[in-house]
Structures are given as structure tokens and as C-alpha cells.
Amino acid sequence: MELTVLTRSAHPPGRRLPSWLKRPLPSGDFARTVEVVERSGVATVCQEARCPNLSECWSKRHATFMILGDKCTRRCHYCAVETARPDPTAKDEPERLAAAVEKLQLRHVVITAVARDDLDDEGAGHFARCVTAIHGRCPATTVEVLPADFHARRECIEALCEAGPELYNHNLEMVERLTPRIRPQGKYRRSLEVLRTVREIAPSMLTKSGVMVGLGETTEELHQAFRDLREVDCDVLTVGQYLQPTRDRHAPVEKFYTPGEFDELGAYARSLGFLSVASGPFVRSSYNAAEVFEESRRRARGSERNRG
């Protein structure tokens, strides 16, 4: 059976979803993952952002955890996460998160967070404590962090890097021209500066970024974004189709890219020297994150600059 991925989302009026944007119904360990997540009391971006890969990933016991609450201080016109005054930070969240990772027996975990512009350190310290808790309880588990930009504050980025995540992921999200309109509280150049700063602070740490397509960008603009990421020595790139969370509050889908077009974008990105590139309709920042991480680490160990 097939399940249309936008069962809780909208898409442009009069525009039918392409055949490749269909997914099988959940199976395997889906129910087990649901149970562990619900009992732990931790949030996942899989649910909050209405990710189309939820069924597939949860069936494989893959989950991306979202810390620092489920309310964001920023409003981006592509994101399904609620914008509101955030709740106080839960001090026991790092341990609850680590317990969930242990129960799910994850070999690689992705932690993301809402933007917390209301906090003095924008949540960097709490983020670092979550990484430390997971490493303490699950020493064999590798940790990938996907934070907001911290306004590119070096002390915040440094605090998180010092916790020792194996991979630092920060998304560029879209091409530069579209950023002011669709991501008004973010800045394209600031996101590049975040990745540059990570490389300066932790030269051996893998870095990663993601770009959405279908918002009205041109191919040359995408190529420029990929080149900009390589200029700050970004190691890993993900490229995926933007899907409109709601009809009335989010930017419309301007184009559904074909699998062939994703292959072409991926080929161009690989020609620039990324260690790993994932490009496809369902690709998201954390999609197949464990496999992408292992591929990147293996290639990094074989390169001149050993990041192992």
C-alpha cells in the first residue's frame, strides 16, 4: 500500500503530487519507537516538523530528537514548528534523552532544537549537556547536532563543540536570494559563518548542511549555494524537496523536482568535493543520518586531512 506523504500537510491548489512522492505504510519497529518516544517525554522533529520520512525512519528505529521545547522564537515560512513564547527549559531533559537513546539502541543519534533567542546562551549550554549525557550513557553512540545559528556567536558554538559531537550540522536551508523573504530571522551569510567557525574551533569535526529545493530558485543559484558551502569547508550536503506544511501560513511549492533532477544536483555537488552528498525528493537533514555519517567518516579517514 502507498501513503501520500502530505496527509497532514497542504500542497499548491490544483497541483497533484507526483508519483514519486508516495511512501509505504509503516512496518517493523515503528510501534516500538512510538512507545519509547512517548514514554520518554522527549519531542522529535519527526513529529513537530511533519517529516514525510517519519514512517520509514521510525520503522528502522531512527529518530531525530528536538530539545529545548517545541515552541520556536522564530517564524520561518517553510517550517511547521509552532512559533510562540517557549516554556522554561527542562533540566532533566538531557538524562531523559539519553535514556531514550539507550532504549532504542541507537548507534547514531541526531539532536536538533528550536531557536531559543530568549535564553542568554540561546540554549547552547543545554545542547552541550544533552551531548554529554548521551556519550556518558551510550559511549558507542555517535552524536550529530543540528542547532539554530546562535546568531553566529563564537562562545555558543564553542560551548557545543567542546561537548564533542561527532558531527555538527547547520542548514543553509535555501539559496541566498530567497532567504530574506522565507527565512526572515535567519541570514544566509550568517549560516555560512557558523560552519566556518565550527571548522576553526574543531578542525577534525565533520560538518554538514542542507538545502531545500522547490521554492523558486534557479539551478545556478543552487550551484552557487553548494560552492559557498564548500568555501567554508563543509563536508556533507543534503538536498531535498520542500513540501508545504499548510496552505495558508507557509510558502507555496513552486516546483516538484524529478528524481533525475536530484541526481543531476547531486552529481554537481559531488564534483565540488563534498565527502558525502544525499540528494533526492525525500532527503532531509537527518534522513539516513547514520549511513551518511559513516560514509563521511570513512572518506575523511582516507583523505589528506584526517578527521577521524
Language-model features, listed with the residues they occupy:
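Short functional micro-motifs and their immediate structural scaffolds
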Residues: 56-59, 77, 81-84
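Short cysteine clusters
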Residues: 51, 72, 76-79
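Alpha-helix N-cap/helix-start and coil->helix boundary motif
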Residues: 73, 175-176, 244, 284
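Core AdoMet radical
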Residues: 80-97, 103-194, 208, 236-238
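Glycine/Thr-rich phosphate-binding loops of Rossmann-like dinucleotide-binding domains
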Residues: 75, 119, 178, 247, ...
